[in-house]
Design a protein with these regions (language model features):
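Conserved Ser/Thr-centered positions that define the repeating blades of beta-propeller domains
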Residues: 77-78, 179, 197, 268, ...
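Short, well-ordered beta-strand elements
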Residues: 348-360, 377-384, 412
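Extracytoplasmic "Venus flytrap"/periplasmic binding protein-like
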Residues: 378-445, 615-624, 641
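Hinge/lid segment of periplasmic solute-binding proteins
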Residues: 417-470, 485-486, 647-653
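Extracytoplasmic/periplasmic solute-binding protein
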Residues: 460-464, 469, 488-587, 598, ...
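Periplasmic-binding protein-like
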Residues: 496, 684-724
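Extracytoplasmic/periplasmic substrate-binding proteins
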Residues: 550-681
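C-terminal capping/gating helix-and-loop segments adjacent to ligand/active sites or protein-protein/ligand interfaces
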Residues: 661, 725-812
Length: 814
């Protein structure tokens, strides 16, 4: 039948993670008492899970799949999740076909419902083989349903869910959930706007529940069905199929206009309470009183761990829960019991505060890694700007500066979007050379990146990630680019093509300025901190010409795509790929402050875009990509591309004699902070990176070991990866990627791991970087705003430059 897992003896207090809180104030109030503590049970190994539920006899059940064979496994616990009995499940079979599951779930009586389809075995295509639209016809699989009985036998179920569609379009397979009363509920309809209730024994239809629009999710609380969508939460009675009304108080609390984190609702098996979780923690909504309370804070639980993905959360009893997570850091499963302890403080007394202007999930994860190693430290994450909270960037910075000057500021500051030089000149940032220099000496971090931030032997700031700008495209084209003028000339040359865009981004006038700033905006200010009118005028003239070529090309490409899509059956004549609607309201706000704050968010993308080499591997819809490599995976894509297309290459873009890099997640320590030593420990941890750095799109980690380990074939083999070597390419194979489009064109590409020559070249390029860019967001936003007015013909070139000078005169004189 299987094996029994052993219970872990140690009971750990909840891990200290991270909570998003606006502002910088720190209270000195006496700690309140009581919080949930985590007891980790030894979980099933070599598998991942996708469901956790309570059966009607009180047993706890999980369903998952083997990491090795991807076949389904059931897990049953008779003691509240402390020990598990496992059993491999047999799926329905058809001769000559393979079985693929869509959805699988436990019915309350212990039977298992499975949704599946049969398909021909996959045949590896020959190298370079491509299916064309002439010989490819996509066929929707025939979705089937069966019951796996408690004795392992299989019973087929005849269900035709396509009858609920309002048109001929298929919505794919239908998701289902099993209710505590034994019934099964399917999400159906052409737009997934219906829920159908079937008897769990006979599978006869009992009730139909219709939403106003697409139903995003549905859960059960006692005899109530709760459906959720973007803007409403509705309760139904599953005993009679009648609507009971909207949960107005919950809508306001969970999905209202002021809410920054969209909730995920949980099937907990509770009879009276609806649970949901967000980035901030787990909440309980009392169905009787209509009140909502946070019961588990992500700052002190695994719910704050970005590497743990919640699969199930069930109510075992009063103030007692069991949760199952898929743990990406270990490719395993975590089973955690939560019990309320009224005799401990609600948060650990030992606290440290980290601040960023905008929310940063990379920082979240890095702090999570620190907190796992330091469970007695409460790391509080404070965010200056939360979207739609009414706080402007100016307000947030004033609050931060006031707190720092008053000695109540955060201990660690993420300096992205802040004026670090101003803080340094005022003595507000601590010298970190005592923790950075040892990391340089033992080659933990890139020496040249750290040296770019060393002044008179002191280091006040340092990035944890960085990119460096490259231009990707046809070798002959990109080799002609050496400065802004030559880039404009190349744009002109490529503007006559109609079947491709010039760049792989759609640009408005403003975002084009943002994308060019790091390379060509460093001379907008003179040494006396006044506007360099000659340099800015030259920039406006050249970029105006460039923008005209881009617009001409985009218009032609849009027409080309409309003509192409018009060949598809069922084409909507009203369809348009014109981006004018996107640009029409760009940056428009009711007030100037709100306009500026909108730009703050947009700067995150266009100042530091990724080249996305994978787009050139498949449907190459653009001639050029300009930006930085987003990290390890993007470099793998680049190496694969270069080995598959000898005409494509890349060129590192420089700023005159400067080999620039674009830093991100720049950390500094508050010189007036009260926890400097702990702050240094946290910064050291941030510089180590974390286990999922390979999947980051922030660029390369400053931690050299991360790069070495990511491309180490020996380490991959030690970790259990079976790697095939392609002698013709002189590269190990990572795997294959597939692509298909609406016309039936499909293609597969063998992904290649960088070899030693590739890795050494990458290191050489990185080690020659010598200048980290800085961003004056106030200057940049004003320049982009006036450039937009100029190219739209609202004002003359001379007036646009004069407006920049006049509007920034006071700011630049401070």
């Amino acid at each position: 039948m299987g094996k029994n897992s052993k219970k872990i003896v140690a009971i750990t207090t909840a891990l200290t993670m991270i909570a998003a809180i606006t502002g910088c104030s720190k209270g000195n109030e006496k700690s309140s008492m009581g919080r949930y503590v985590e007891e980790r049970y030894e979980a099933p190994t070599n598998s991942y899970v996708n469901e956790l539920s309570i059966l009607e006899d009180g047993r706890i059940a999980m369903l998952g799949f083997s990491n090795e064979t991807n076949t389904p496994i059931s897990f049953i616990s008779d003691d509240g999740g402390q020990n598990w009995t496992t059993q491999d499940l047999e799926l329905p079979k058809q001769d000559g076909k393979e079985t693929y599951t869509n959805n699988i779930g436990y019915l309350s009586d212990g039977r298992i419902l499975v949704s599946y389809y049969f398909e021909e075995p996959y045949v590896e295509p020959t190298e370079g083989e491509t299916q064309s639209e002439e010989n490819y016809v996509y066929e929707e699989p025939e979705y089937k349903y069966s019951i796996i009985e408690t004795d392992g036998s299989i019973s087929d179920i005849d269900l035709d869910l396509t009858s609920y569609n309002t048109d001929s379009d298929s919505s794919g397979y239908n998701n289902f959930k099993c209710a505590p009363n034994g019934d099964v509920f399917f999400s159906v309809g052409s737009n997934q706007e219906l829920i159908v209730q079937f008897d769990g024994k006979t599978f006869e239809e009992k009730n139909i529940y219709e939403g106003n629009d697409y139903i995003d999710n549905f859960v059960f609380v006692g005899d109530s069905l709760i459906t959720t969508s973007y803007d409403e939460i509705v309760e139904y009675d599953i005993t009679n199929g009648k609507e009971k009304g909207n949960l107005k108080e919950l809508e306001k609390e969970a999905i209202g206009e002021k809410v920054n984190y969209y909730p995920t609702f949980i099937n907990s098996g509770s009879k009276n309470t609806l649970y949901y979780y967000t980035t901030l923690g787990v909440y309980a909504y009392d169905m009787k009183s209509g009140k909502t309370n946070m019961i588990i804070d992500s700052a002190i639980s695994t719910f704050g761990d970005e590497e743990s993905n919640l699969i199930g959360f069930i109510e075992k009893g009063e103030k007692n829960f069991l949760a199952a997570f898929n743990d990406w850091s270990s490719d395993g499963v975590s089973v955690i019991n939560y019990t309320y302890n009224p005799d401990i403080t609600s948060t650990p007394d030992n606290q440290i505060v980290i601040y960023s202007l905008l929310e940063n999930y990379m920082i979240r994860q890095a702090i999570s890694a620190y907190s796992k190693e330091n469970p007695d430290v409460y790391v509080k994450y404070e965010i200056g700007l939360n979207y739609n909270d009414g706080v402007t960037q100016s307000d947030a910075l004033k609050t931060l500066n006031t707190e720092i000057m008053g000695g109540n500021g955060p201990d660690v500051i993420i300096l992205d979007g802040l004026t670090a030089e101003s803080y340094i000149s005022k003595g507000l940032l601590e010298d970190m050379s005592d923790i950075i220099n040892p990391l340089i000496e033992n080659e933990t971090i890139f020496k040249n990146i750290a040296q770019a931030y060393t002044k008179d032997g002191k280091i006040y700031q340092i990035p944890t990630y960085f990119k460096y700008p490259i231009l990707l495209g046809n070798k002959e084209d990109i080799n002609s680019v050496s400065d802004l003028s030559s880039l404009v000339e190349l744009t002109k040359k490529l503007s006559t093509q109609t079947d491709k865009m010039i760049f792989n981004n759609y640009f408005s006038a403003r975002t084009l300025v943002y994308s060019l700033y790091n390379l060509y905006g460093n001379d907008w200010l003179k040494h006396d901190n006044t506007i360099n009118e000659d340099a800015l005028t030259d920039f406006f003239i050249k970029v105006n010409e460039m923008y005209g070529y881009i617009k001409t090309n985009q218009d032609a490409y849009n027409k080309f795509m409309e003509d192409k899509y018009s060949q598809l059956e069922g084409f909507d004549n009203g369809f348009s790929v014109d981006n004018s609607e996107i640009d029409e309201d760009y940056g428009v706000g009711d007030e100037e402050d709100s306009e500026v704050d909108y730009e703050v968010y947009d700067l995150q993308y266009y100042l530091n875009p990724s080249v996305s080499a994978d787009s050139f591997l498949f449907d190459q819809s653009s001639s050029l990509s300009m930006g930085g490599m987003s990290g390890i995976n993007d470099y793998i894509n680049l190496i694969t591309l270069l080995n598959n297309n000898s005409d494509i290459g890349y060129k590192i873009l420089t700023r005159g004699e400067e080999n620039i890099f674009i830093p991100s997640n720049i950390v500094g320590i508050n010189a007036k902070g009260k926890n400097k030593e702990q702050a240094k420990e946290l910064v050291t941890s941030l510089l180590k990176g974390y286990s999922r750095d390979n999947y980051s799109n922030n660029g390369f980690s400053i931690n050299l070991n991360k790069l070495n380990n990511a491309f180490s074939v020996e380490k991959m083999k030690k970790d259990g990866y079976e790697l095939e070597y392609d002698e013709s390419k002189n590269h190990y194979i990572q795997g294959t990627w597939g692509y298909s489009d609406e016309f039936g064109n499909s293609k597969e590409v063998t992904m290649l791991l960088p070899n030693d020559e590739d890795v050494n070249k990458l290191k050489f390029e990185i080690e020659n970087l010598n200048v980290g860019t800085t961003v004056n967001s106030v200057l940049l936003i004003e320049v982009a705003k006036q450039f937009e007015s100029y190219v739209n013909g609202d004002i003359s070139l001379e007036d646009s430059i004069n407006k920049v000078v006049d509007n920034l005169d006071l700011y630049l004189s401070e």
